[in-house]
UniProtKB/Swiss-Prot annotation:
It catalyses: Endonucleolytic cleavage to 5'-phosphooligonucleotide end-products. The keyword Hydrolase applies. Its EC number is 3.1.21.2. This is Probable endonuclease 4. CDD domains: AP2Ec.
Amino acid sequence: MKYIGAHVSASGGVENAVLRAVEIGANAFALFTKNQRQWKALALKADTIEKFKRFCKAHQFSPEHILPHDSYLINLGNPEAENLAKSREAFIDEMERANQLGLKLLNFHPSAHLNKISESECLARIAESINIAVDKVPNVIAVIENTAGQGSNLGYRFEHLAEIIDQVEDKNRVGVCLDTCHLFSAGYDISSLESCEQTFSEFERTVGFQYLRGMHLNGSKTPLGSRVDRHHTLREGTIGTDFCKFIMQDDRFDNIPLILETIQPEIWTEEIKFLRTLAK
């Protein structure tokens, strides 16, 4: 079964994200559990946690189909010791918040080496950061998102993801989220059914579908291999819609959250319906 939703606002309390997902006809969703542009946040209140869990149960949202995203400030491979420690502390807090809400996943952008350390050193720091976090917080899987490869950001090659995973001690506590806009911008062609098969076969060989814990379904405003991250709606932009058909008709993408981060929230309901029409 396909679980489709969007990254909805948690404004006014994380429990409201559940209701906003219901409004757009979703059976999966993503959210921030705190302000994504601040390092610190007030602790989740007991009544907020209770409402979130109650609303999820009432509307049949399973923890496996909810994909919280961490703060954009966090850089788990930061070359500077002080900033690395700050990022690790913030990531552990994000994991604790997810665990408090009964969630099983935490999506994050891997890192940027800032041209101060090598790619391998940066990837090793990311893996070490995951090891530290999962040792401190139970239950939650660290879900690495592929990137478009802007600037010194890593994670734009499948090999980067594999190198991180290889150095994570508990393989049950690490996973991957593939963003279709990022894939295309990084040079992985998904503009036809044939190119999708080639790209996802390469993913299987390099990383493995057993690690795929979610996807972000986005169009792109930039051409193949641009290394620029600019999301578009599903049916506009440079990729086309064959990738949507491929994903919706392939059971390797069953039972994971398929999350829209497209640029017009007002058409998310329509985009979710469109995706469902493509299913077998």
